[in-house]
């Protein structure tokens, strides 16, 4: 049990996919200007990342490895991710049309989010079992969501702040992201 808790904590805080591995930067910078859309993107990404991680493990274990098709791993994982994203988009469109409009192009772009594919491939490379794959996917999603929501809240405050003209917009966003990354480096010694 403690092994799973350590995996979760290390994935969320120590090895955060956005701030440490630099995966998922497109939605991190693109959807983080408003807190409402960041929360919606976080929920959608959490669902997609967790489910894609589980399904990718199953595809790898029960289709690719038994039939010696490991050379199709990346392509099959992208296909799994695309199916999960389409399912998620249909659910979001049916349940919350306003959230679907707010997320706009970023919801279908979860398919090309390198963090989602990165989690699936790292599960294979690190030889995680089924439960570890699910926890790793969920932890990566929680870490992504945590960083996205915190960054979005900071960007909303910065929009109202008196920022010097050369630093307005993307420049102050990059500085803020760098400072967040430094703050998360403080968790480095937490888990080995």
UniProtKB/Swiss-Prot annotation:
The chain crosses the membrane at residues 5-25, 39-59, 65-85, 102-122, 134-154, 171-191. Keywords: Cell inner membrane, Cell membrane, Electron transport, Membrane, Translocase, Transmembrane, Transmembrane helix, Transport. It is a multi-pass membrane protein. It is found in: Cell inner membrane. It comes from the Bacteria. It holds the Pfam family Rnf-Nqr. Its EC number is 7.-.-.-. It is an enzyme of class 7 (translocase). The keyword Transport applies. One of its GO terms (biological process) is electron transport chain. GO terms for cellular component: plasma membrane. The complex is composed of six subunits: RnfA, RnfB, RnfC, RnfD, RnfE and RnfG. Part of a membrane-bound complex that couples electron transfer with translocation of ions across the membrane. Belongs to the NqrDE/RnfAE family. This is Ion-translocating oxidoreductase complex subunit A.
């Amino acid at each position: 049990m403690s092994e799973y808790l350590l995996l979760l904590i290390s994935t969320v805080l120590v090895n955060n996919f956005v701030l440490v591995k630099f995966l998922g930067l497109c939605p991190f910078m693109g959807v983080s200007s408003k807190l409402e859309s960041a929360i919606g993107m976080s929920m959608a990404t959490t669902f997609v990342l967790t489910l894609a991680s589980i399904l990718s493990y199953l595809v790898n274990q029960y289709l690719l490895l038994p039939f010696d098709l490991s050379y199709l791993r990346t392509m099959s994982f992208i296909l799994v991710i695309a199916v999960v994203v389409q399912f998620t988009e249909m659910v979001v469109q049916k349940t919350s049309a306003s959230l679907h409009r707010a997320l706009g192009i970023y919801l279908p772009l979860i398919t090309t989010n390198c963090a989602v594919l990165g989690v699936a491939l790292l599960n294979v490379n690190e030889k995680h079992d089924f439960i570890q794959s699910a926890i790793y996917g969920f932890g990566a999603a929680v870490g992504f969501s945590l960083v996205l929501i915190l960054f979005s809240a900071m960007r909303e405050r910065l929009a109202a702040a008196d920022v010097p003209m050369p630093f307005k917009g993307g420049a102050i966003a990059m500085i803020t992201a760098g400072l967040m990354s430094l703050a998360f480096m403080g968790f480095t010694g937490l888990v080995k």
